[in-house]
Amino acid sequence: MAIQLSDKPLLEWAGDTLAIALFEDAVELTGELGSLDEKFAGILKELITEEEFTGKANSTVFTRVSSNIPVRKIILVGLGKTEAFKIETLRRAAAAVGKVGKKQKSKVIGLSFPLWNNDPTASAQAIAEGLQLALYQDNRFKSDPEDKGSQVETVELLGFAGQEAAINRANQIVSGVILARQLVAAPANSVTPITMAETAQQIAQDYGLQIEILEQEDCEKLGMGAFLGVALASDLPPKFIHLTYKPEGTPKRKLAIVGKGLTFDSGGLNIKGAGSGIETMKIDMGGAAATLGAAKAIAQIKPNVEVHFISAVTENMISGKAMHPGDILTASNGKTIEVNNTDAEGRLTLADALVYTDKLGLDAIVDLATLTGANVIALGDDIAGLYTPDDALAGQLEQAASESGEKIWRMPLEEKYFEGLKSGIADMKNTGPRPGGSITAALFLKQFVKDTAWAHLDIAGPVWADKENGYNGPGATGYGVRLLVDWVLSE
């Protein structure tokens, strides 16, 4: 799909499908819209009246028009109340238009949307993101794709002439989101630790990033006993991925994104039983997928920020070599961990990844992981949990969430809860009592960051959508890429 920019007035546009956005309870046709309705022989007013269209957010109505009108189809989309108008409103409204246009076999859509905050650049970028994310289709694993009908070929953004840079930025970010979606959606026999390392190498080759892949023996030399303990049972070699983007000159900040990378999680010897969703555990590398997606986007945008993209990637499998419940592992900072549940493995891999990252002398680290079901119980499917002792970093991430539309909610890091992780024979256990499980998981990770501002994002909910939700169809969402890119780009 091509996105074109036009300075053609709404009254002069002619083509296949015209899409117009209206605010809730402000659907009266005055000014330019009144003139357009007159030109269209009252079709707009008739559509609003007959369909009882009120402009509710993301609601749409559609009609075909007679041959004497300069457009063949009309879509009206609601923006909700004016006082609730956000940049995300445009993203979701554009997605709604794209879906209706595709369903109605529109080839070319002329899109008339208002500006958010009088900012044509941010508005154009958001619209382009919403359209592309909504219309993305993943048919890689279908021999005969179901969705092979008419596709939207071109969308013209009316009144956005000169915003080529905004569209280019949207394309760069969306390319990272789609990479993350593809990695998460692919089954575990398609995306393995080896595949993830090859993907990172391809990003480095395509965009000039530095890369280091630590093999098992390299990790052994660094004392990564927690990560390697999880990797013991797999027949596939673990891969510790470290991509680095460095700008020309002196960077204004040095940051790291660390993603959990379990390409499949069986639960280990504490195997996931019937009804546990074990068949969905290909998604347990959603953090690493977002990390690589962010790397792809950042490498194209080229900000004046040094960014490290790190993931310890392996499977959590079952074999005679597997770690046992009750084993004691030693992480690379010397801390010992009693494994009281082999299905709490993600935090073990992250422990060594965080120790490694903490030694790089950075300004801040953000890790993201499909870490706990407890976070999903607390916040549902749309919202990631934010855990950090650093108020400034929390504020940066909350602002990035607001701009990107990827929701987060700051959760407490109640230090008293660490009592539940104490072990009688090691420094700590890898799980605590059931209450506050997402908090104790974050407190566990906190033990492996000593010198750097740090935040943890538990993305177990929003990494996957069971049903259509805005610009996310059912399946992998690519959650985290846009949030992290906005964080990196923030001043």
Swiss-Prot record:
Family annotation (InterPro entries): Leucine_aapep/pepB, Macro_dom-like, Peptidase_M17_C, Peptidase_M17_leu_NH2_pept, Peptidase_M17_N
Residues engaged in binding Mn(2+) 1: 265, 343, 345
Name assigned to this protein: Probable cytosol aminopeptidase
Cofactor descriptive note: Binds 2 manganese ions per subunit.
Gene3D superfamilies in alphabetical order: Leucine Aminopeptidase, subunit E, domain 1 (3.40.220.10), Zn peptidases (3.40.630.10)
Location in or out of the cell: Cytoplasm
EC number: 3.4.11.1, 3.4.11.10
Catalytic site positions: 272, 347
GO cellular component: cytoplasm
Protein family according to the UniProt entry: Belongs to the peptidase M17 family.
Reaction it catalyzes: Release of an N-terminal amino acid, Xaa-|-Yaa-, in which Xaa is preferably Leu, but may be other amino acids including Pro although not Arg or Lys, and Yaa may be Pro. Amino acid amides and methyl esters are also readily hydrolyzed, but rates on arylamides are exceedingly low; Release of an N-terminal amino acid, preferentially leucine, but not glutamic or aspartic acids
A GO BP entry: proteolysis
Reported cofactor(s): Mn(2+)
GO molecular function, one term: metalloaminopeptidase activity
Its biological purpose: Presumably involved in the processing and regular turnover of intracellular proteins. Catalyzes the removal of unsubstituted N-terminal amino acids from various peptides.
Residues that bind Mn(2+) 2: 260, 265, 284, 345
Alphabetically ordered keywords of this record: Aminopeptidase, Cytoplasm, Hydrolase, Manganese, Metal-binding, Protease
EC class: hydrolase
Domain of life: Bacteria
A Pfam family recorded for this sequence: Peptidase_M17
